[in-house]
Design a protein with these regions (language model features):
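Active-site-proximal segments of catalytic enzyme domains
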Residues: 241-283
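Acidic, Mg2+-coordinating phosphoryl-transfer loop and its flanking beta/alpha structural elements
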Residues: 220-223, 290-340
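N-terminal chloroplast transit peptides
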Residues: 1-12
Length: 355
């Protein structure tokens, strides 16, 4: 989108933000010599999709959202942005501040990892265990029953977060009790991961490599199982020293058998920096008030709670299913929403601009 140099178009007080993708009528504004602008609307899409001023000759123009245009976000069919002006300002601030001011906070399952591959659902951390031949049949049966009962509650747009939390705690506690009954050994986890179909989202390895190169702290929050998550990171060779995992970790007995879980329960609605108790990690965050937050659920929006203020938090959300039902809520919560995107292309594009 472009406007004449020095002009800011508000269109009668309306902010020119739009849901991206899809044609719309083109609006032109003619500026007569006496100055009052006259609007003309064409009935179909223009070649450029731009809103432009005309006054006899084509004026010199500048982009209204230059950074978003560089990123290719203004015409991408899978991208939704509710407030273009705010996101332009956020991204521009992150880019101009550079890597030294940046930290990244990311969910893991279906954010750093793929949802599906060639039409088949990929394993999450829980799914790796659920689908492993090393687990007894009764575990898979019971785990599937719990999934069928509680997952619809997790994603129900008609329920508030406060209403969902008790059910999520019930779900996690029951799964954890099942795991303890199975007497899972620590040494079996590597085999579970290597035999699973878990895959990183395309471009995740490149993103992790670049963030490690520039020493950017990466905090991975997961309501899954931390021991399995760490095995996945090792398996794909992305578990670098700038990355910290906050999740539910197993407690083992002397023989390496799971007998419980360490610390407080992490579920999808209490993931935030207040859950971190490592002073060493917070030392790394000094002066890093710019955040790129990546998540696939509405609960992930709060992961940056606890970041020192003032801060600039760019929230990028992956909307993987039930798009029509959940799109409005995702656009309200995330700055950029990516629909059925199995890549890290948008995130990598932002990071490349910072170089």
């Amino acid at each position: 989108m472009i406007v004449s140099r020095g002009a800011v178009l508000r269109a009668g007080g309306r902010q020119l933000s739009r849901v991206l993708g899809g044609a719309r009528p083109t609006e032109h504004i003619t500026e007569p010599s006496k100055g009052s602008a006259i609007r003309h609307k064409s009935s179909g899409p223009s070649d450029s999709g731009f809103c432009q001023f005309t006054a006899g000759i084509m004026p010199e123009t500048v982009p209204m959202y230059p950074t978003l245009e560089k990123l290719g976000l203004l015409n991408a069919a899978h991208v939704r942005i509710k407030d273009l002006a705010r996101v332009e300002e956020l991204v521009s601030s992150l880019v101009s501040s550079g890597f030294s001011k940046l930290q990244v906070i990311a969910d893991f399952d279906r954010t750093m990892t793929r949802v599906s591959y060639f039409g088949k659902l990929c394993d999450t951390c829980h799914g790796i265990m659920d689908n492993s031949s090393l687990m007894p049949a009764f575990y898979r049966e019971e785990a599937n029953k719990l999934l069928a009962k509680y997952y619809p509650i997790e994603i129900d747009p008609k329920m508030s977060e406060e209403e969902k939390i008790p059910y999520m705690i019930e779900w996690y506690n029951q799964i954890h009790e099942l795991i303890i009954k199975c007497k899972v050994s620590q040494k079996s986890l590597e085999e579970m991961v290597s035999s699973s179909n878990a895959r990183l989202r395309d471009g995740t390895r490149d993103l992790c490599k670049k963030l490690h190169e520039y020493g950017v702290p990466v905090l991975v929050f997961s309501a899954g199982m931390g021991d399995i998550l760490e095995q996945v990171l090792r398996h794909f060779d992305v578990y670098t020293d700038n990355l910290k995992v906050v999740s539910n970790f197993f407690k083992y007995d002397e023989e390496g058998i799971v007998v419980g879980f360490e610390g407080d329960l992490i579920h999808m609605f209490n993931k935030n920096e207040n859950a971190i108790h490592s002073s060493d990690y917070f030392d790394k965050l000094t002066g890093r008030n710019n955040v790129i937050l990546l998540g696939d659920s509405l609960g992930d929006i709060k992961m940056a709670v606890g970041v020192p203020q003032p801060s600039n938090v760019l929230k990028i959300g992956f909307l993987n299913d039930k798009v029509e039902e959940r799109l409005e809520a995702y656009m309200d919560g995330f700055d950029i929403v990516l629909i059925d995107d199995q890549t890290m292309d948008v995130v990598n594009s932002v990071v490349r601009l910072m170089e």
